[in-house]
């Protein structure tokens, strides 16, 4: 399928694209010259000020230069007394200046050598008297700077060149600026419309470009707008407004615990009403609520706004206050049930490989660009206020594109945020299990379809769909019918992007991908068939925007792992260890099916179920694991206030056992195999269970730790303590070889000690 060039808000760096407009840097990120240009005055920070010089003492009739000359003369006479062979015409000495004649300050002149000699003599005297320690011998200095480069490693030479280049930025004093203006020149420096100095090629100096994406600290913008301006610009028509409409607003919040002084608090439902007092105490200056909320009592806030539709207000107000950042960025939305997070990470890496600074908001966090993480709540991707604020921060830090996970978790049935201007819509797949995400099947489909219905401009928008999913035609038909659709498939050769050949292994995935513009050979650390689908989706996005094929491959291959998503733990062991967040019977089944395709000798699986909820799924989880794993280790996963042994009793029902029957076998330290020949063990302490399972691994096996994924906590009773499955696996792998060398049999649980013990 032919792909037309896109006309995004900020052009992509393709050969046919024009240069993007200069980006305004945060004031605190500008180099000194940039700060001068923006304010026309430079005031160095206090830490940069030099200490004031001492007042010159002229009571003896000699100025500072005359005093210095006398010191030199005394040193000259002392030198002649100690070394008579050195005469005044010796090249060591310079001719003394005649009266009234200015002395030479040439750095190469012997005048400075004599000063150094006088200082050295004084140091020797103090050393002899024991006042100071002897100086260490000075290392020999190379005569030329190139000699230093010969002694450096290639990486150090590159760093040295970078330092020299950045040292070209100098602070310009106010006097220098006035002299330049008086002479009718600007020192050869051109400035952009925003006051930022331009490079020789006309581009704005960017600190992040100079020191690398990982070297620049993220800056957070400040916003200010009166309530009256916000209501006017957002086109929100309130039912009633009481109080001061000229109150200045600095932010918007719906979570009372996040409110800061100057914020507007959006009171949503009973939960919002419960947090109203806290928001008021934290400094909320205005409150927005709907007519169903009964606000009684006296609030310290200065204004109250009543609206008909609080959901619309929740979207419109933050978009307006944060200046609608999506209008100035290329925004890619990824929707679906599975693979959304991995696909978003791959697409972002591909964009950055193209040189497009790209942010992201997803369930694993938010990023301004590169690995520069933003402060965000875990559920930020489903919060319209948080998304607008995070995108504004990305834009403020120079991001040109943004990846948004348009998952149904936290998304209302009305669909994606209508205040976000999407450019590309991507579908991974649709799997609706019962009342998933609190929606019916129709609501679930319409919610994700709302993203594709926004694709109406054939010049700017694109749809990317997985035609192996039965719902693909429904999503492709949404929005404009003339908007290009890029399809991908695992085996369907009619798709624009499809696999030609692939190979799965315990440590790597290799795939040949056919595209309309050529064949791509991709080697990835992401494991399993499902990740091939995610790779295909990313390639399809690259095709949709006309990305260079080499950048598509480079970006995808740079992603070695997605935290907690079939994440490989590699400590150079002879067997695979995978950590995944699968915590439902369906996701566990798909995970183990994918692991089976890797061709392992055995599968050892650790599963746990949370306390105080979803008791019905506990036996089902065990049944799935016992059918698709050779060895199963049952354990706890955030038992909270429920007894972990009660949870394990429920889980054992999945294989027809009770806790009492299991413990009877424990009297002989032998647990018989299940009817299918598979083994099952349990331990209520998760740390013990995870480490025991890792120790069971042998060459060719795969140990799968499920449930937590990238979560880093364990909740027991009322305590929430740090716990990371990945770190537990790495720790256990350090000792497996030692256990085996000691003759300990870790294939059973409890472990079997050698007879010598």
Curated annotation (Swiss-Prot):
User: Which biological process terms from the Gene Ontology are attached to this UniProt entry?
Assistant: biosynthetic process; cell division; chloroplast fission; regulation of cell shape
List the molecular function annotations (GO) for this entry: acid-amino acid ligase activity; ATP binding
User: Where is the region Disordered?
Assistant: 1-112, 126-152, 172-195
Q: Has keyword Acetylation?
A: no
Q: Where is the composition biased (Acidic residues)?
A: 47-56, 142-152
- For bias type Pro residues, the affected ranges are 12-30
* Transit peptide found in the keyword field: yes
What segments bear the compositional bias annotation Low complexity? Answer: 1-11
Span of chain positions assigned to the transit peptide in the UniProt entry: 1-53
Query: Where does the record place a coiled coil?
Result: none
What family, per the record? Belongs to the MurCDEF family. MurE subfamily.
**Subunit structure, per the record?**
Component of the plastid-encoded plastid RNA polymerase (PEP) complex.
Explain the purpose of this protein.
Answer: Required for the activity of the plastid-encoded RNA polymerase (PEP) and full expression of genes transcribed by PEP.
Q: What NCBIfam families does this protein's entry cite?
A: murE
The protein, known as: UDP-N-acetylmuramoyl-L-alanyl-D-glutamate--2,6-diaminopimelate ligase MurE homolog, chloroplastic
Which lineage is the organism of this entry classified under, starting from the top rank?
Eukaryota, Viridiplantae, Streptophyta, Embryophyta, Tracheophyta
* Gene, per the UniProt record: MURE
